[in-house]
Amino acid sequence: MKLLFIAAEGAPFAKTGGLGDVIGALPKSLAKNGNEIAVILPYYDVIDQQFGNQVKDLFYFYTNVGWRHQYVGIKEMIRDNVTFYFIDNRDYFFRGHIYGDWDDGERFAYFQLAALEAMEKINFIPDVLHVHDYHTAMIPFLLKEKYHWIQAYQKIRTVFTIHNIEFQGQFGPGMLGDLFGVGLERYEDGTLRWNNCLNWMKAGVLYADRVTTVSPSYANEIQTVAFGKGLDQVMRMESGKLSGIVNGIDTELYNPENDPHVTFPFSINDLSGKAKNKKELQEQLGLPVNENIPLIGIVSRLTDQKGFDILVSELESILQQDLQMVVLGTGYQQYEEAFRWFANCYPEKLSANITFDIGLAQKIYASSDMFLMPSAFEPCGLSQMMAMRYGTLPIVHEIGGLKDTVEPFNPFDKTGTGFGFNHFSGFWMTNTLLFALDIFHNHKEDWQAIQKNAMSADFSWDTASLAYEKLYMDLKLF
């Protein structure tokens, strides 16, 4: 199959979160199966700085963004049997960052128009076109309402993936004519309208042939008032074409046997290196060195979504237990200051690292005994899967992708890959943590069995990509 991905970011070129990880890994995995894969990304200044000497200039053309006649440079790079095309316009994409500008609507309107017009010029007409999040959500609409006259485009099937429904791309309706060059008919009849705004994500859901999210549970949750962020009625209406596929992780990168950030390699059959890594991390962070004290890791953005409101409210009580905790991340000032304060009060129990350090993150995944992830909502989540690869048992709120990837330990039949709580509250989070501490201290055989279950779970992209491939094949035959 010929498959084309269009997205606002993709690792290793430009990445701010899970979307970048998916675009970096899924196309590569699909290419292994013999598919012809291409990806179109904006050419940001960060890409120019790191990969500028590796990309090749192909050609340029101009596109109309409303009344604006804008330059479109096309660059190319082949990596892991995937052809990456980059849309180059320095006015729009050389900003020192990917998102957050006042004219993001114009920037990504331009990108979508340029990407659609580039398909014909680079002679890559896909069987399936896969777009991601609101930044490219207007593409299925544009294919059917603006570019339907291009014969080569008429058989293209589209997939739209929602990585986080919270960010929907809501703009003034005048953008339809001013930027996209189409009429207001689909806004005035309510198709593209939500809350008296033009809603890009709603357009993607209604016009794509299939809609996916990044876990089955999240696909169900966004059909509810609690998690649909206002689009729950639309999601219920389109539920027949909605499905959830759990993201994978790069199991070659997150491998305790050869991770370059991990001093002492270990495996599912020999966990002795994990204890040595724990000792090294305790020394590095200035915590008392004691392998019998459970070490709880947290690598996260410090926000309400990630559950830090309930964690901070319980932290005083938690730190009375015989444990150590290491926190790595940045976020809301109130949580950054709270962790600094508790680390100052409990220097032998809490290490607060208010920064982001990939090397330290890997050490935390590899060296901790438990990984705390009490998210209020989590479309998929990758950290819990990374932790399990290293035998670090996750303690999670059973929501979204956390529910789909972590099986809570059952003391009766000894199954499970971690620990979970159903009700989003500090009380239930703390109770679950206390249960995990009891297993760690008093049931060593059970603990080791859970570790082996977690380390043997299959979270590879090669497995996840098979589900996408089936979806694409069903669409192609449709």
Curated annotation (Swiss-Prot):
Matching entries from Pfam families are given as: Glyco_transf_5 (PF08323), Glycos_transf_1 (PF00534)
EC no. given is: 2.4.1.21
Look up the record and give one Gene Ontology term from the biological process aspect.
glycogen biosynthetic process
User: Out of the domains of life, which is the source?
Assistant: Bacteria
Which InterPro entries does the record cross-reference, listed alphabetically?
Glyco_trans_1, GS/SS, Starch_synth_cat_dom
Metabolic or biological pathway, per its Swiss-Prot or TrEMBL entry: Glycan biosynthesis; glycogen biosynthesis
Protein's UniProt keywords contain Glycosyltransferase: yes
Q: Which UniProt keywords apply?
A: Glycogen biosynthesis, Glycosyltransferase, Transferase
**Record's keyword annotation contains Transit peptide:** no
Query: A Gene Ontology MF term for this entry?
Result: alpha-1,4-glucan glucosyltransferase (ADP-glucose donor) activity
Q: Which reaction does it catalyse?
A: [(1->4)-alpha-D-glucosyl](n) + ADP-alpha-D-glucose = [(1->4)-alpha-D-glucosyl](n+1) + ADP + H(+)
Purpose of the protein: Synthesizes alpha-1,4-glucan chains using ADP-glucose.
The record's comment on protein family reads: Belongs to the glycosyltransferase 1 family. Bacterial/plant glycogen synthase subfamily.
In terms of PANTHER family, this protein maps to: ALPHA AMYLASE DOMAIN-CONTAINING PROTEIN, GRANULE-BOUND STARCH SYNTHASE 1, CHLOROPLASTIC/AMYLOPLASTIC
* Protein's UniProt name: Glycogen synthase
Gene responsible for this protein: glgA
